[in-house]
């Protein structure tokens, strides 16, 4: 055989191999495409599932044009505020156990008013409770523009959530546009979903937690077990809710708001370590008792960073207070909490929330401060 014969055979062998390689490559391409399709399908299922869960949340129509932000905020303040996501957290005393009952005018007060400020870069969270009995200016921003100077808790009662948000913005120079509001059932369920929390209970709290347990059980239809011991105690959902409601036994509303922030902190820390099964249980039980203005996309973005959130500040507003039992133009005698110089307290607030030194409040805040001083005669 000559060289040319071998050459022909080699070429024939090469021709016979090529179709096999093409078939193999085509099969791998098909497998890859199929795998990508499966992954996309799974992603779509997960998105559908999560969005479906989020749709359980009550989203009443909110008139964003009726949410007031002080126009006199200067450029530096606006720039600072844009670095944070500020949300108003509201706890309703609604006796109506339905989520629709959260937004009924003339029925519910916001016993818990908490400013949650999230640093968009560091994910640091700072919580400041506005004491419910603090005298602030609020108005019917959505309709009549009627103005009242009364307890902060009354804004929601008289005029609704737009008024409550606007009250915080105009009195404290903030830019809040969104809120999350829960009833007692939501708090009960979320604490139960994370497996309960451990709280230090003193003698006064032991008495009052059981008093509030009876009332909370009556109004929610939930069964409960009395707390028996002082010291470090493991509380279930309804016990933790009763703990958050305590106003007596020392510390009044100041101590109560501290309890509320403590419970939030403990729940967040436990939620960060929840497995998917428990997280799903929490979603199922809690979302049906929440009202919010946040859209699905915003909630998903916030949820993505849950593990990164760290609550680094927990305090109350105002920091310097005084008390009166009457206000000019207010016919009822009530225990009012006054910011001892509202403008000075707002300066402190901006340091606490945003690390701004020597903040100069807007003329609006200074005018409100002057009016409260005249109505109360306290400073």
Which sequence ranges carry the predicted segments?
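Extracytoplasmic
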Residues: 82-85, 108-113, 120-130, 163, ...
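Amphipathic, coiled-coil-like alpha-helical scaffolding segments used for oligomerization/assembly
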Residues: 153-221, 273, 293-295, 299
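Entry/capping segment at the start of metal-dependent catalytic domains
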Residues: 18-23, 28-124, 301
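N-terminal targeting leaders characterized by basic, low-complexity, disordered sequences
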Residues: 1-21
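Second-shell loop/turn segments in exported
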Residues: 98-105, 149-158, 173-178, 247-255, ...
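Extracytoplasmic/secreted envelope proteins and their assembly/folding machinery
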Residues: 110-113, 161-169, 184-188, 192-194, ...
């Amino acid at each position: 055989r000559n060289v040319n014969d071998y050459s022909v055979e080699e070429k024939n062998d090469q021709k016979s191999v090529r179709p096999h390689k093409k078939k193999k490559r085509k099969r791998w391409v098909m497998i890859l495409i199929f795998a990508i399709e499966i992954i996309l399908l799974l992603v779509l299922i997960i998105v559908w599932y999560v969005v479906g869960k989020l749709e359980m949340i009550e989203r009443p129509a909110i008139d964003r044009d009726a949410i007031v932000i002080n126009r006199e905020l200067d450029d530096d303040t606006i720039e600072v505020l844009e670095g944070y996501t500020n949300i108003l957290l509201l706890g309703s005393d609604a006796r109506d156990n339905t989520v629709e009952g959260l937004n009924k005018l003339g029925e519910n007060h916001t016993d818990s008013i908490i400013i949650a400020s999230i640093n968009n870069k560091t994910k640091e969270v700072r919580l400041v409770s506005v004491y419910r009995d603090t005298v602030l200016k609020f108005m019917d921003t959505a309709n009549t523009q009627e103005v009242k100077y009364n307890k902060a808790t009354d804004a929601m009662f008289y005029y609704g959530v737009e008024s409550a948000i606007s009250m915080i913005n105009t009195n404290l120079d903030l830019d809040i546009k969104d809120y999350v509001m829960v009833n007692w059932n939501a708090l009960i369920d979320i604490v139960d979903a994370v497996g309960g929390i451990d709280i230090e209970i003193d003698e006064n709290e032991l008495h009052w937690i059981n008093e509030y347990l009876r009332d909370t059980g009556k109004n929610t239809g939930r069964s409960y077990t009395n707390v028996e011991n002082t010291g470090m105690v493991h509380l279930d959902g309804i016990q933790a809710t009763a703990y958050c409601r305590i106003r007596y036994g020392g510390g009044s509303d100041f101590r109560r708001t501290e309890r509320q922030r403590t419970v939030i902190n403990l729940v967040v820390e436990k939620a960060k370590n929840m497995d998917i099964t428990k997280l799903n249980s929490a979603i199922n039980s809690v979302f049906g008792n929440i009202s919010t203005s946040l859209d699905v996309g915003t909630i998903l973005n916030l949820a993505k960073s849950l593990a990164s959130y760290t609550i680094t500040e927990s305090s109350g507003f105002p920091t310097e207070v005084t008390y009166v039992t009457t206000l000019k133009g207010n016919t009822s005698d009530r225990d009012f909490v006054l910011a001892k110089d509202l403008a000075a307290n707002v300066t402190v607030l901006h340091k606490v929330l945003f690390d701004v030194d020597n903040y100069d409040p807007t003329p609006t805040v200074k005018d409100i401060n002057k009016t409260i001083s005249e109505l109360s005669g306290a400073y």
